[in-house]
Amino acid sequence: MVSEVEYGSGMSIDVSAVRNHFPSLSRTIDGQPFAFFDGPGGSQVPTVVADAMTHSLLHANANCGGAFATSIESDAAIDESRQAAADFTGSKADEIAFSANTTTLQYLLAHAVARTLEPGDEIITTELDHDSNVSQWLQVAADHNLVVRQARLHRTDGTLDLHHLESLLSPKTKIVAFTLASNHMGTVPPAAEIARHAHSVGALAWADGVHYAPHRLLDREAMGLDVLLTSPYKWFGPHLGIASIRHDLAASWPANRVRPADETPAGHRFETGTQSHEAMAGMTAAVDYLAGLGTGSTRRERLTSAYEAIRAHEDALALQFWEGVSGMDHLHFYGITDPEQFDDRVATFSFTVEGAHPTEVAQRLAQRGMAVWDGNFYALSASLALGLEEGGGAIRVGFLHYTTPEEVDRLIGALGELG
């Protein structure tokens, strides 16, 4: 039975009640419950998100700026979505930009900032990153005669080699692009420290918060970030891209726009064409769903409270999983494996199985009603650095706040039978 989970902070999450918000979690395959360990590739969605999107389409489906009721209601919903995104990212509403997805925003913003740089200027990326925070820099570098350097990860534990990153910094460094959490193996690098290093040479701190956001609360201002991007479909919302851009940058970078388009708010300058109003409404509902798991007088306070409980629940699942699999000699794990260092990782694990191709393992687990991913997960640099690419990559499992201890036990048992 799925029970209430208690936390040291006094907060608790009734996991059964949480799961009731997600119709997909009641799915069965061949008579057995279906376990979603595929969260690193996209989360499930609560009913309130689908309801908000449906309401937007059926009752407030109009473009912006009109004098009539549906347009006025649509404008209000868009304003609220900017505030919700700001509350979620720890920034201000006028710093928010929306697009179809985060990769699209990465390319759009990279091309914008590249127009402010000089030939020979340098950009630093890391081997921990999803390729959407690497490839766009390689492409704008080729277009603008820039230089891209890449900070290494430690092969032993999947952490970022900060000494190597520091050695790459110079007066020519203009952007340090890094992830807040590895979508491959869950590593959480020290964001505020990296941002300070970037700022010490006058560079921007540009962070991919996509994988971090379902596990820990984003805070662009507290982390010292200049640009932060995230994707609601990783944290129980719809497919959408969000960027939080420091106001002076959002207001000044060149933006590709049609002539009649508004220049305010600042983040809106990067929103080409009509956005998905229904996805924005769904995103607001996802933020409010998460905030509803916590307590406080403001949305941000409720989010902070909720994420304390979410982190505690996921940390317990991660430790349960590791205690169950660490003695299995046929499994080889990548990333942090010392429980004393689990504060520096989220509940995402990648591994290989001796003598089995990752796709075969994923298929065998799928037959047992478990969703897992295999491959490189678009974290190509990490897959290459770890020597995994030629062998088909790795298997990846992830736990979210709706994952139960019973599901983790099922996974442990299934992995044990692969040996």
Regions found by a protein language model. Give the residues of each.
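Pyridoxal 5′-phosphate
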Residues: 2-419
